[in-house]
Amino acid sequence: MERALILAASAIGAGLAMIAGIGPGIGQGFAAGKGAEAVGKQPEAQGDILRTMLLGAAVAESTGIYALVVALILLFANPLLNLL
């Protein structure tokens, strides 16, 4: 019974952790749109704008990657099961 409860709570926690993937998707879309807008206004600064946009996208994506790691740990290498 306790094991089933821990597994169920872990599955729910993994699902909630994956909700964090929504934020990076929205942020990267917003950054790409603003980057395209900036290149349209100043085509000569395309290299600098692209570099800054890619750095921002990498930082935003790290949140989604951390959420994926937490979800995978909860599902496949659950440390809470060792407490039983």
Swiss-Prot record:
CDD domains: ATP-synt_Fo_c_NaATPase. GO terms for cellular component: plasma membrane; proton-transporting ATP synthase complex; proton-transporting two-sector ATPase complex, proton-transporting domain. The chain crosses the membrane at residues 6-26, 64-84. One of its GO terms (molecular function) is lipid binding. Keywords: ATP synthesis, Cell membrane, CF(0), Hydrogen ion transport, Ion transport, Lipid-binding, Membrane, Sodium, Sodium transport, Transmembrane, Transmembrane helix, Transport. Inhibited by dicyclohexylcarbodiimide; the enzyme is protected from inhibition by Na(+) in a pH-dependent manner. The record marks I65 as: Reversibly binds sodium during transport. It is a multi-pass membrane protein. One of its GO terms (biological process) is sodium ion transport. It is found in: Cell membrane. Belongs to the ATPase C chain family. The ATPase of C.paradoxum is of special interest because it uses sodium ions instead of protons as the physiological coupling ion. F(1)F(0) ATP synthase produces ATP from ADP in the presence of a sodium gradient. F-type ATPases consist of two structural domains, F(1) containing the extramembraneous catalytic core and F(0) containing the membrane proton channel, linked together by a central stalk and a peripheral stalk. During catalysis, ATP synthesis in the catalytic domain of F(1) is coupled via a rotary mechanism of the central stalk subunits to proton translocation. Key component of the F(0) channel; it plays a direct role in translocation across the membrane. A homomeric c-ring of 11 subunits forms the central stalk rotor element with the F(1) delta and epsilon subunits. F-type ATPases have 2 components, F(1) - the catalytic core - and F(0) - the membrane sodium channel. F(1) has five subunits: alpha(3), beta(3), gamma(1), delta(1), epsilon(1). F(0) has three main subunits: a(1), b(2) and c(11). The alpha and beta chains form an alternating ring which encloses part of the gamma chain. F(1) is attached to F(0) by a central stalk formed by the gamma and epsilon chains, while a peripheral stalk is formed by the delta and b chains. This is ATP synthase subunit c, sodium ion specific. It comes from Clostridium paradoxum.
